[in-house]
């Protein structure tokens, strides 16, 4: 039986930021260098995640990506040959839906990071829009990240890979993930026949539908990209009021129940 797995994985950080043990998008293709100006590489203590720039000072990622001495890289495409406009920041503040780090609670795996200073928009750095409405079933969406391109072999690309997947009926995910409630604030997305999926190391990265961030990579199957085992994404639309309140300065804002 495919085991549920949390998608952050050990990353051996080297000066070149080469990855030796993390994983990312399965069944995709190398992203175009201009395709992901909002994509953030989040790393700490040997772990890596993805993230999404939503304005010059704020990043969305998964709560289980939290850690000490976090760094965030913007404008990154090739890890070995960085863009000239690459920028690095650290968190100034972090905001969570949970008072504890029990991030496995469905629909609460979200973290909002305020940067220590704003990033400068450039050729390879620009925010992604928040959702204006939730995605409907069968919507084609995009996933992306810097990890393994094989579910069984350690094949790590230098540049992020992208893949298209579909928003699926929530019942498909409930059939596989014990305890996932029908009304949980999550999205179920993938390819029913398998072959395309997020994987370890993709945690916190975006699910992009119609040019907007609709989901945050949370939990998936192990091995990745198995038939009828889609991944679960925190549903950004259901957290819009909380996100906007925090950014507006209401740091006591509470998450939706």
UniProtKB/Swiss-Prot annotation:
SMART domains: Tryp_SPc. Disulfide bonds join 31-162, 49-65, 97-255, 141-209, 173-188, 199-224. It comes from Craspedocephalus gramineus (Bamboo pit viper). CDD domains: Tryp_SPc (cd00190). SUPFAM superfamilies: Trypsin-like serine proteases. The keyword Hydrolase applies. The gene is TLG2C. This is Snake venom serine protease 2C. It holds the Pfam family Trypsin.
């Amino acid at each position: 039986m495919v085991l549920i797995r949390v998608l952050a994985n050990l990353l051996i950080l080297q000066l070149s930021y080469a990855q030796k043990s993390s994983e990312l998008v399965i069944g995709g293709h190398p992203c175009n260098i201009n395709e992901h100006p909002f994509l953030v590489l989040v790393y700490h203590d040997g772990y890596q995640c993805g993230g999404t720039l939503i304005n010059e000072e704020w990043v969305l990622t998964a709560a289980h990506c939290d850690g000490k001495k976090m760094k965030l890289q913007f404008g990154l495409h090739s890890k070995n040959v960085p863009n000239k406009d690459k920028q690095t920041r650290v968190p100034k503040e972090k905001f969570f839906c949970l008072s504890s780090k029990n991030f496995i609670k469905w629909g609460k795996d979200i973290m909002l990071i305020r940067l220590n200073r704003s990033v400068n928009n450039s050729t390879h750095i620009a925010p992604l829009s928040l959702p204006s409405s939730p995605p409907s079933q069968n919507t084609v969406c995009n996933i992306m990240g810097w990890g393994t391109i094989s579910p069984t072999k350690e094949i790590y690309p230098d540049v992020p890979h992208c893949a298209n997947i579909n928003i699926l009926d929530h019942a498909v995910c409930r059939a596989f993930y014990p305890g996932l409630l029908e009304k949980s604030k999550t999205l179920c997305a993938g390819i029913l026949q398998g072959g395309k999926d997020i994987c370890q190391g993709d945690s916190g990265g975006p699910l992009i539908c119609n040019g907007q961030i609709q989901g945050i990579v949370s939990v998936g199957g192990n091995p990745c990209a198995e038939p009828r085992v889609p991944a679960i994404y925190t549903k950004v639309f259901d957290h819009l009021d909380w996100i906007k309140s925090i950014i507006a300065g209401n740091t006591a804002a509470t998450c939706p129940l």
